[in-house]
Structures are given as C-alpha cells and as structure tokens.
Design a protein with these regions (language model features):
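N-terminal adaptor-interaction module of cullin-RING ubiquitin ligase components
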Residues: 1-35, 41-44, 49-52, 70, ...
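C-terminal capping region of solenoid repeat domains
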Residues: 4, 12, 19, 27, ...
Length: 316
C-alpha cells in the first residue's frame, strides 16, 4: 500500500478503514493536521495509535461512531498530539470520565469537543476538561450525556468565558441555578444553546439567557414543559432587540399565542420558529390572533419531532 503524503496534504479522510489499514499508513504522514475516520466501526485504539504517534501537528480528529474506541486513545492523544484543538467523538460510548480527564492532561488548547451520546461521561470528566481548557474552549457538545449535571455547567461558567456553543440536550439533571450562572459568566460570547429535554429548566433560565446574552442567535428548549409565556415577557425592555435567529419551543405545552407574540415583536431577526406539538399554538390560532411573523421567518407548526432540518442543524 503506497500513500503519498503530498496527495493527502494536511487532511486524511478514510471510509471503512480497519486497524490493519491504519497500521500500513503508520507514520508516513507526519504533516497531517486533520483525520476523519468517522463511523469506521472496525477501527480500534490500536489502529489509530499507529498513526497518531507520528502526527505531532494534528489539530482535528473525527472519530464519531467508532464504537471500539476507548479511554486509551484519548490518553494517547494527550501524549502525542498536544496541539489538538478539535475532537469529535460522538457515539464513542466506551469513553468515560477517565478518558476526558486524560485528554485534558496533555491537550491544553482544545477549542471544540463533541462527546454527544457518550453516556459514561459525567461531571468529573467535564469539570476537569473545563478547568484545563478554560479560555480556549469555544464549543462543547454533550447531547444525551445523562450523567452531566449542574457541576459541569458551573465549571463552564467558572472557567470557560469564551464559550460560544453548548449542547446539553437530554442532560436532565441540569437546573436553573447553573444555567443562570452560565448566562452571566458567558454573556459576551454565548451564541448557541441547545437544552431540549432538560426537564428541570424553567422560565427563570430562559429570561436570564435572553436578557444577558446579547449575541444569542439560537436556543432550543424543546420538551422543557415548565417553560411558559412568562419566559418571554419584557424582552423588549429598554428598547433591546434580540439577535435571536432560531427558537425551538416544540412540545412546550404551556406556551400560548401571547408568548409567541412577545417573541416575534422582540426578535426581528428570527428565521426559524419551531412550535410543533404546542397544543395552544397552531397555524389557525396564530392567524386568528393576527400574528405577523417576520417575512424571513420559517414557522414549523407540524411534522415529526424526529425530523431533521439542515438549515437548523447548522446552529448546533
């Protein structure tokens, strides 16, 4: 197997590769800065280590869906690839707090980490990672990491003031206390926050976010059934106009047309509004109330909550 590093340059993207294939690549590509082996389900720590040992300039590693990957790979990364900035390990559910902590020991310049659906990752690992990454961390995705709670969010608020994107959908132990702390600490940077299915979140969190985070462009509180119209009251106080472009409030059963009116009057830049499965907010009820949505705003009244919209997904 002959591989010319001039062909691949700084980027290597492989499909269906195994440990044997990675071993043949070995250390022949020392200039690699980005490796994408997502969903290579036969690839394990052993195969990737063979390449990583020679990639001291690696900046990005995408291993999403590589289910055989364990903590050992993250520990190897911390020793061999200290310039790593972006790790996508979504769905690698053999990774635990030990792996995240090990990564933090050596990789101190991390800008982006995606551990979505890694259900063995919880507060101890996230807190350690937040403290070490501190001001460099811009994006953290922890979708359906159900062991993540307030301790993690408080750590982010304490150390990661440059955080722009946070995904904690499905982290059901997160409460208002930590979200409000985050809203104050990251108010000058936070742009995108996904916290659907965070069932302990109330109006208090949303009010704090909307009033403090002036750059907030996307927020998802779908299925947070304690959210009411009160979350959107006084949004236009002191003439403030929200920069919000995306609001997902699907299955927020207490929201009414009055709440939606407050949103559209204060969010003139709104491009996407998701009100699916909101029984009090229908196309008919909005028309009867005479609501005038911004001309560029797409309102989603119907459809399955499992449906994905690429124009919305880009925010998270």
């Amino acid at each position: 197997m002959m591989i010319n590093p001039l062909i691949f340059g700084p980027l290597l993207c492989l499909v269906g590769v195994t440990d044997v294939g990675m071993a043949k690549i070995g250390d022949r590509l020392p200039s690699l800065q980005s490796i994408d082996v997502s969903h290579c389900r036969k690839l394990s720590d052993k195969g990737l280590k063979a390449v990583l040992l020679g990639c001291q300039h690696l900046r990005q590693l995408v291993i999403a869906g590589c289910r055989l990957i364990t903590d050992n790979l993250l520990i190897a990364l911390s020793k061999s690839c200290i310039h790593l900035e972006d790790l996508v390990a979504a769905g690698c559910n053999n990774i635990t707090n030990a792996g995240i902590s090990g990564l933090a020991d050596g990789c101190h310049k991390m800008k982006s980490l995606d551990m979505s659906k890694c259900n063995k990752v919880g507060d101890p690992g996230v807190c350690k990672f937040a403290e070490v990454s501190s001001s460099s961390l811009v994006s953290l995705k922890l979708l359906d990491c159900n062991k993540v709670g307030d301790k993690s969010i408080h750590a982010l608020a304490k150390f990661c003031h440059n955080l722009e994107t946070l995904v904690i959908g499905g982290c059901r132990d997160v409460t208002d206390a930590s979200i409000e702390a985050l809203a104050f600490a990251c108010c000058s940077r936070l742009k995108c926050l996904r916290m659907d299915w965070c069932l302990k979140i109330t109006d208090s969190s949303l009010r704090s976010l909307l009033s403090n985070c002036k750059l907030l462009v996307a927020i998802d509180v779908g299925c947070c059934d304690q959210i009411t119209d009160a979350a959107f009251q006084d949004m236009d106080a002191n003439g403030f106009q929200s920069a919000l472009r995306l609001l997902k409030i699907s299955s927020c059963v207490r929201i009414t047309v009055a709440g939606v009116r407050n949103v559209i009057e204060s969010c003139m830049a709104l491009e996407h509004l998701d009100v699916r499965s909101c029984p009090q907010v229908t196309r008919q009820s909005c028309e009867q109330a005479g609501l005038q949505f911004p001309g560029s705003c797409k309102v989603n009244f119907e459809g399955s909550l499992s449906e994905s919209d690429p124009s919305v997904d880009i925010f998270f």
